[in-house]
Every structure is written in structure tokens, then in C-alpha cells.
């Protein structure tokens, strides 16, 4: 494929700035080396970055405008964020007032243009930077300025990798936001369910005066009452009462006849053992 527009006059593209003299020196050095070696010069594509894209500016426009300076290859424009897009649509709908369908055009934030020759890309970026985009008086982009920058040693594969990385980061961020929203929803549902259980317990007849009741350990009397309620529990309760009465009668007889009580006899026998 023949490369168009390689031989460009510097007067047509405009004067070069002093900050890019180093790049020109490198190019001249490469050209002199190629001429000395007698080898054919290899055409290397170059990429120019567009930092500002006016509204309703499309890849076809940039291709038509920049094709006059050299052969343009691939062009990619980054669309605006979905949140900004929805905001603009809502603003357009409110401005229309519901009388007619609101007209909204998809806008872009930044773009990349590939030239077949990197030397042409460098010259275009230097000469057209901060110049009007439209040369005609009726052009809708007459009052917009070019914001061009040549990306040194940047290839189209680097751009593809960068865009794929941004898409992956966006997906991961979306998954994290969805997981966070799900956790918050589950916590809210559990809290609502717990509150419903508490409200349902307000009508419980086992809690007088609407006070909260908490389960405690049963007392000795309650335990005896439960045992007595079991089959055969009455007989065991009678035996326990008889044993208690016998113990009380034994202490009474000991007091009457002057004999020591069983507790005192145990207390007297303990020091004898210690001695």
C-alpha cells in the first residue's frame, strides 16, 4: 500500500516549536543512518491523542480533516460515561417539556488517531495543536481548537490493552458494588424479620402487662413440683417428707435428753481427727 502525503512542506503545516527540535534531530539522524546503510526506509505508524472532542464530532469528521495532511489509519473515540449520558438525556427531556421528543446525540470524551507514518503524525500534532478545528466560516467546529499530542513509542496494541484493562476494572468495581448492595439488603431484611418477631411476641398471654420475660433456672420448689407431677413422683415426695420429719424429730429428742445433735457430734469429731 502506498503511503499518501509523506512529502509535506513545513510551511503548509506551520512552524515547529522549539520543544520538538530534539525529535527532529532524532528523525534526521535515523534518515541519515538509513541513507548511509543503503536500506529502504521502513514506514512505522504513529498515534496522535485527541484530548478534546466537541459535541457532535464524529470519527468521520476527524478522518476528513486530518486526511489532508497524511494517510489516516484507525480511529477510536472513547464514549462518555453512562452516568453523564443519563444526566444529559434527563436534561434534554426536561428542556423539551414533554411536547416533543428530546434530541440527544452521543458525545465522546477523548480519541486516538493512527497515521500510517509517524513522522506525519509528529508534524500534524505540532502544527495543528491549539489551532481552529474548522477552517470554513460555516463549520460547526470553527470555534473549537485542536488538542493534539503525539504519543511517542505508543502502538495500537497498547491502546487495546489499556481499554481491556479499563473494562476489567469497571466490571470488578460493578461486582463489588452489587455485592455490597446485596449485603446491605440482607442485613435490612434480617432486621425487619427480627423486629416482626418481637412485635408478634407483644400479644403473648404468658407475658403479663406486656413486659419481657426471660427464662431462668428453676427453683428447688419448682423442681420438686415437676418431679411430683411425674408418675411415681408422689411416693418419692412422701418419702422425702418422712425423712425430713425424722431428722427434725431426732434433733428435738437430742435437745430434750441432753444428747448432742448430729451436727454437733460431727463438729466435735473433726478436731479429734485433725489432732
From Swiss-Prot:
SUPFAM superfamilies: RNA-binding domain, RBD (SSF54928). The gene is ABT1. InterPro entries: ABT1/Esf2 (IPR039119), ABT1/ESF2_RRM (IPR034353), Nucleotide-bd_a/b_plait_sf (IPR012677), RBD_domain_sf (IPR035979). It comes from the Eukaryota. This is Activator of basal transcription 1. It comes from Bos taurus. Residues 1-39, 200-275 are annotated as: Disordered. Its main location: nucleus. Interacts with ESF1/ABTAP. Interacts with IGHMBP2. Belongs to the ESF2/ABP1 family. The keyword Nucleus applies.
